[in-house]
Structures are given as structure tokens and as C-alpha cells.
A protein has these predicted regions:
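Walker B catalytic motif
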Residues: 161-162, 169
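The feature captures the beta-strand-to-loop junction immediately N-terminal to the Walker
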Residues: 36-39
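Conserved structural motif at the start of ABC-family nucleotide-binding domains
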Residues: 2, 19-23
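Helix-to-loop junction immediately C-terminal to a conserved catalytic motif
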Residues: 51
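Q-loop/switch helix immediately C-terminal to the Walker
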Residues: 87, 93-109
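Conserved ABC transporter NBD signature motif
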Residues: 59-66, 112
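ABC ATPase NBD coupling module
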Residues: 67-82, 226
Length: 246
């Protein structure tokens, strides 16, 4: 489905040039892929490169065999790639119902909108006609954003640290949402996360550190290393949902 060929991304500032991604080569076809690794390792940059928010300095991105490297985020969305920001965007003047309708590509009726909001643990009657603005908390915005991804139903859904700003009760509900997506949807889900409970439901785990792939394999092979048996720059501590980056 998705191929990254020799993807490199560099930025320049007053201190010179810095390489954020270094010759990344990946082929992604699994239903559920989790990316993890230390903060600043390049995970979010890689997600934005896939979504089309930023363009790689070098390399090529193929989606269903098509070279999408030069395509904008809008064009990639039309081809079936959706992206959930780590910090969701607020839309003054746009209601939750409007946002779900835009995501679904049609006018969402009350029943459909309620179903999507219920999936993420929100009471529809309290949110449908609310504006997606500063009156909503970060956790509420995050759950609404995930509801729009569900409504969109794309071939590839990319989530950048979806647990950020989510309280403990909501986090348990979030895991159920991803488990259901994994079990029922025909598309693929790509999640950037440090959380053991999310990594534990992935078909494949990829560790990104210092802009490069440091480990890549099935959960049974990679997760024990992340839990402390092998130093790959970032360990996920079992049972604590915390990362220890070195």
C-alpha cells in the first residue's frame, strides 16, 4: 500500500543544515503499524511527510503504486490518506456536526454523527451543535478529531500520539476504538505512540530514533526490547505507560 524509498528530510537555520530523516526505506501493508522512539527522533516528521504536510528533501513516496511525493495534503486526502494532528486544530464558526459531515464527504444525519461521537466516548447531544473552538478542552478536541477520522473511513489513517491530552478513562476507550478499527476496517492504521497498550495491539512496531529506523518487526520481536531488554534510545516501561528516553 505505502512505500517510502530513500526518504530524507533536512531543514536549515542560522546554525546550518540539520537532517531530521535519514534515508528511510519502508514498505507498509499491515493493518496496524505503530511507530515509537524517543522524542525528537523524527516520528512526527515522518507522519507529516506521509500525509503531505511537508515534502521530503530527497526520496519518493508511493501509495497504491502511485508516486504521491509531489502531491499536496488535499490531493493525498482524496486518494485515501487521513491525518490526525498531535494538537488538533480549532475551527471557529464550524460545529462538530459540520466537521463530521465534511470528513464523511456528505451531510451527516444525527444518527450517523451520534454513532461516531459515541465511539469516542462523547454524548452527541452535548456536542453536535457546539463550535470546534477554544471552548473545547484538548481531550475533547482529540476525541472529536478521531471521530472525524472514523467518519472519513480512509485507506490509511495516520494518528500522531492520539493519547496526548486524554485522561485515563478516555484512554481505555481510545484503545477500544483502535482495536475496533483494527478488527473491522479494510484500511490500514498507522499510530505514533509511546504507550505500551497501543503498541501491544499493533501488527508491526517500527522504532525511529535520530531520523533512522532502529528496529522493525512484529510485536513479539520488538516489544520485549522496548520494555527494557535492549537499548534502542527509548524504552517503554511495562505497566506505567511512560517512556524513558536516553
Amino acid at each position: 500500500m505505502l512505500q517510502l524509498e530513500h526518504v530524507t528530510y533536512r531543514v536549515s537555520d542560522e546554525q546550518g543544515e540539520k537532517t531530521i530523516l535519514k534515508d528511510v526505506n519502508l514498505s507498509l501493508s499491515e493493518r496496524f503499524v505503530a511507530f515509537t522512539g524517543p522524542n525528537g527522533g523524527g516520528k512526527s516528521t515522518l507522519a507529516k511527510v506521509i500525509a503531505g504536510i511537508i515534502t521530503p528533501t530527497e526520496g519518493k513516496i508511493l501509495f497504491d503504486g502511485e508516486d504521491i511525493t509531489p502531491l499536496s495534503v488535499t490531493e493525498r486526502a482524496k486518494r485515501g490518506i487521513s491525518y490526525a494532528f498531535q494538537q488538533p486544530v480549532r475551527f471557529k464558526g464550524l460545529t462538530v456536526r459540520d466537521l463530521i459531515s465534511i470528513a464523511a464527504g456528505r451531510s451527516a444525519n444525527v444518527s450517523d454523527a451520534c454513532a461516531y461521537l459515541s465511539e469516542v466516548g462523547l454524548c452527541a447531544r452535548d456536542y453536535l451543535d457546539r463550535e470546534v473552538n477554544a471552548s473545547l478542552s484538548g481531550g475533547e478536541l482529540k476525541r472529536i478529531e478521531i471521530a472525524t477520522i472514523l467518519a472519513r473511513g480512509t485507506k490509511l489513517s495516520v494518528f500522531d500520539e492520539p493519547e496526548a491530552g486524554i485522561d485515563l478513562w478516555s484512554f481505555g476507550n481510545l484503545i477500544k476504538v483502535f482495536e475496533k478499527m483494527h478488527a473491522e476496517l479494510g484500511g490500514s492504521v498507522m499510530i505514533i505512540s509511546h504507550q505500551e497498550r497501543i503498541l501491544n495491539i499493533a501488527d508491526r512496531i517500527i522504532v525511529i530514533s535520530a531520523g533512522s529506523v532502529k528496529a522493525d518487526g512484529v510485536k513479539a520481536d520488538v516489544l520485549p526490547a522496548l520494555l527494557g531488554t535492549l537499548d534502542m534510545g527509548c524504552r517503554v516501561t511495562a505497566g506505567s505507560d511512560k517512556e524513558d528516553c536516553i
